[in-house]
């Protein structure tokens, strides 16, 4: 800041101890942003950028923005003819539980449906499926890195390409539940709503784009609420789906590893057959440390849970709230689940398939 710079100037008139680092450069743990010496403008190195959105959140001037699909989503809903021409589903990230201080997740879900969606589905249900499949894959391959966070996946592919073969082959929770919706309701359209800017890139992946039409953020969701005059605080509570506690806590760091551990237990995998030893990386700096250890053959753990955002998805750049209560809110959301296990959630999922 200028005040701090003035202090340094008084202490050292030669500016020998003054170092100005722009917020975007400081925020980019992937080291993808640099200052052009001639123009003095910040430049993003696309070969290093992982689309985590940290620079977007930290820039005080709004000089860096993500590409919005809000108008396309509105058109998609309008052209559905009240979901008679085709149905539009909203898949909502479990970090929805931490977006508002005194508003229940069920009220937010009701507000989203009031935007014109045919139904609102928990991405956490997809997380249950991913935890189950990832546990099976891990027990077979003996080492994996998670695939749920697209920014973490990008970081491996760009920074540690030799480790890319260890990335889980499973779809993300968003894509997993969207695929189920497409199979259940042929011709439907799916919109993901969450805290993540990197998801906007993920929906363009070859294996994802056939399931998810658009990804918008919680900030864009709130803009749609405001535009349509929806006061979520006054909404009646909508009925939530059948995601388990373990699927819902994917939203915070450590939740994915806990879910995989539970899935291994429910699958009857004993410690003798395979003992899970996970490292949960809280932010890109910790991801880098774990990947460097793996690269050098020094990593003792057999599963890397990578979260590009500190805190996990609850620390995403497009969250409406960033405070100490967020983890507790997500944990409470998990405890409110009607399903006590991942297998119960998957059974409910299979029962829903038969309808």
Which positions does each model-derived feature cover?
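Short linker/helix segments within small regulatory modules
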Residues: 37-43
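Local cysteine-cluster metal-coordination motifs and their immediate loop/turn environment
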Residues: 9-30, 47-61, 147, 194-202, ...
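Charged, flexible boundary elements
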Residues: 27, 31-34, 47, 120-127
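Short beta-strand "wing" residues that participate in macromolecule-binding interfaces
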Residues: 35-36, 66
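Iron-sulfur-associated redox domains of electron-transfer enzymes in respiratory
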Residues: 66-355
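Non-ligating segments of multi-cofactor redox enzymes
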Residues: 1-2, 15-18, 144-145, 153
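Residue-level recognition of alpha-helix initiation/capping sites
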Residues: 19, 40, 50, 103-104, ...
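Short, small-residue-biased leader/transition segments that mark boundaries at the very start
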Residues: 3-8
């Amino acid at each position: 800041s200028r005040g701090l710079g003035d202090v340094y100037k008084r202490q050292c008139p030669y500016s020998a101890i003054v170092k100005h680092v722009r917020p975007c450069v400081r925020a980019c743990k992937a080291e993808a942003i640099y200052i052009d010496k001639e123009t003095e403008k910040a430049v993003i190195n696309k070969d290093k950028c992982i689309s985590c959105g940290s620079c977007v959140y930290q820039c005080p001037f709004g000089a860096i923005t993500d590409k919005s699909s809000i108008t396309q989503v509105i058109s998609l809903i309008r052209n559905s003819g009240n979901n008679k021409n085709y149905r539009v589903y909203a898949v909502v990230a479990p970090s929805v539980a931490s977006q508002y201080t005194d508003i229940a997740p069920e009220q937010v879900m009701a507000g989203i449906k009031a935007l014109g969606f045919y139904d609102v589905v928990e991405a956490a249900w997809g997380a249950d499926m991913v935890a189950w499949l990832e546990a099976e894959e891990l027990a077979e391959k003996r080492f994996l890195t998670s695939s749920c966070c697209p920014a973490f996946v990008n970081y491996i592919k760009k920074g540690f390409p030799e480790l890319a073969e260890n990335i889980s082959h499973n779809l993300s929770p968003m894509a997993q539940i969207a695929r189920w919706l497409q199979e259940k309701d042929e011709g439907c359209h799916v919109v993901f709503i969450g805290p993540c800017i990197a998801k906007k890139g993920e929906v363009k992946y070859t294996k994802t784009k056939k399931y998810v039409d658009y990804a918008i953020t919680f900030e864009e969701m709130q803009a749609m609420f405001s535009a349509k005059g929806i006061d979520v605080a006054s909404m009646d509570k909508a009925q939530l789906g059948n995601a388990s506690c373990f699927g819902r806590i994917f939203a915070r760091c450590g939740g994915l590893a806990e879910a995989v551990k539970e899935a291994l237990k429910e699958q009857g995998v004993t410690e003798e057959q395979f003992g899970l030893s996970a490292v949960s990386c809280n932010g890109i700096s910790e991801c880098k440390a774990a990947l460097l250890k793996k690269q050098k053959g020094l990593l003792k753990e057999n599963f890397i849970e990578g979260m590009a955002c500190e805190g996990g998805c609850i620390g995403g750049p497009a969250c409406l709230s960033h405070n100490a209560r967020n983890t507790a809110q997500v944990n409470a959301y998990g405890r409110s689940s009607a399903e006590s296990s991942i297998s119960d959630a998957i059974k409910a999922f299979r029962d829903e398939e038969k309808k």
